[in-house]
């Protein structure tokens, strides 16, 4: 034994140790994971277990939902184009139909006209159509607020915006009433965070969004995403994830980053789901494997780095 090279000596010593003290070896591995989970928690990143640490360490594909993850999720109204009504009337109609919605665009509409609650508002039969918008009875009028697909499904033609931006179209009792353009800002630190993730071993960055291609493409290009899927309905996002999962390597994993609320089904379809801004969100705690308490996207590469140290 003493004539062997030192690496071979070390290997033989490890074999003897594991055979003699298997429990100690198991404990040391578990302690490494526990230490990593503790280190992440100090940064406001909560990991549900050892398997989640391992899945993060193996991640080579990371999929991002756009709104509230890559962007701030705080929309501002940039342009109002009314048809046969005033700008104020168009905004009020849209905000009223969206009075119960938790979508960031709905918040922007309500803020624009000063709606704070649904109290004393005559809004009934509200239906949120995933990937489309909402329909509601406002007063005694049927209102649709959403994208072109929603209105066209009900035989209503939309006027295409002459300016850039995400368009919210409005129709009342089957008649087109105009559109509202909104914009969101890229989250601070997003570019640096994505570049750091590449250094940590993420080989493919994917952006999924319901936004039209003309809005999503400049953002994806600016942040150097490898793959963009735009104008997606919720079921389209599931299909995109299924494709990525079926084409991953045998020793790699797919991670999805979202808010854990609007994308709960997506979190459950990947190897590791990461929820941003999870503080106070019961849905995020239920669906995600990793919870980033705030929305600091710069913590993602830190989480990946910590997971690799444990594996």
Label each residue range with its predicted role:
Residues 8, 39, 199-202, 223, ...:
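Membrane-embedded alpha-helical bundles of multi-pass transporters
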Residues 14, 37-38, 95, 107, ...:
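Residues within alpha-helical segments
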Residues 1-64, 220-221, 226-230, 298-300, ...:
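Hydrophobic alpha-helical transmembrane segments
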Residues 48-272:
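Cytosolic catalytic headpiece
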Residues 27-38, 76-79, 108-112, 287:
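Re-entrant/interfacial helical elements at transmembrane boundaries that shape
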């Amino acid at each position: 034994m003493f004539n062997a090279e030192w690496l071979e000596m070390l290997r033989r010593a490890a074999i003897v140790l594991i055979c003699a003290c298997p429990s100690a070896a198991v404990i040391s591995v578990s302690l490494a994971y526990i230490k990593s989970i503790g280190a992440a928690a100090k940064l406001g990143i909560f990991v549900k277990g050892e398997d989640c640490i391992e899945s993060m360490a193996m991640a080579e594909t990371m999929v991002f939902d756009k709104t509230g993850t890559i962007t701030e999720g705080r929309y501002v109204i940039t342009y109002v184009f009314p048809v046969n009504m005033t700008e104020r009337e168009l905004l009020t109609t849209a905000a009223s139909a969206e009075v119960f919605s938790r979508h960031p665009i709905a918040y922007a509409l309500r803020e624009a006209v000063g709606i704070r609650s649904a109290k004393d508002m005559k809004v009934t039969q509200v239906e949120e159509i995933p990937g489309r918008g909402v329909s509601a009875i406002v007063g005694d009028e049927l209102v649709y607020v959403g994208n072109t697909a929603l209105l066209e499904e009900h035989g209503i033609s939309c006027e295409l915006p002459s300016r850039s931006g995400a368009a919210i179209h409005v129709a009342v009792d089957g008649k087109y009433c105009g559109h509202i353009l909104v914009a969101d800002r890229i989250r601070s630190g997003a570019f640096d965070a994505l570049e750091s993730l590449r250094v940590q071993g993420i080989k493919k960055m994917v952006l999924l969004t319901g936004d039209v291609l003309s809005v999503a493409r400049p953002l994806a290009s600016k942040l150097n995403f490898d793959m963009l899927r735009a104008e997606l309905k919720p079921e389209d996002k599931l299909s995109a994830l299924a494709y990525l999962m079926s084409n991953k390597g045998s020793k790699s994993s797919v991670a999805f980053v979202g808010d854990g609320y609007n994308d709960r089904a997506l979190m459950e379809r990947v190897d590791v789901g990461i929820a941003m801004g999870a503080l106070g969100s019961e849905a995020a705690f239920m669906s995600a494997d990793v919870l980033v308490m705030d929305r600091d996207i710069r913590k993602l590469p830190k989480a990946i780095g910590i997971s690799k140290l444990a594996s």
